[in-house]
Amino acid sequence: MERKHLILVDEQSQTDRLKRISKNLKKDGIELVYEEINPNDYSNRLESGDLEFDKHTLKKKLLSIRFLSHLDIFATDYNLVEDELKGIDLIAMLYELLPHYNKKIIIYSAQIEDVIDNIITKRADGFKQQITMLKLLAQNEINYLSSDGEFENKIKQLIIKEPDLTIDSRLAD
C-alpha cells in the first residue's frame, strides 16, 4: 500500500473530514498518514485576558512532526488566527523549515476568491513586500480550493495525483 503524508492546519477541527478522506483513499490503495494542527492551541493568555499567538511554539510543533521530511501535502485554511496568522504565513514557515520543499501545497477557504487579493494587497505593505509575496506564491504550485462543497473529493484527487515531473525534480532524484 502506498503511503502519503499530510499536514493540515485549521483553527476548526477537520478530524471527521480527514478520517473520511483517509478511509476513501484506502479503497484506492493509499494509506494517509496525517497530522492536524490547530493554531489556536499555540496561543497564550495575557494578564489582560487577551490571547497572544505564539509563532515560535507553532514552528516547534511543525519541526516535531516525525514525517516532516517525507511530507507529500501541506494543506492550510487561509483564515486562521485573526490579524496574526494567515495560510500564507504558514507556507512561509514551511519554506523556512524545508527550503527545498517542492511537493503539494493547498490553501483553502470558504472565500477562496478573495485569498490572492488579500495576500498581495492587504498582507503586503508596499511594493517590495508585494514582490516578496509574489515570489512566495510562485515558489511552488499552490492549489486553491473552496472549503465548501466538493472539498473532500478535490483534496483526495490532489493526494492521488502524482506531481508532474520536471527536469529539475528528475535530476534531484
State the predicted function of each range.
Residues S48-Y95:
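Conserved phosphotransfer microenvironments
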Residues E11-R17, N40-L46, L51-E52, D77-L85, ...:
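Short acidic, S/G/P-rich loop/turn micro-motifs used as interaction or catalytic elements
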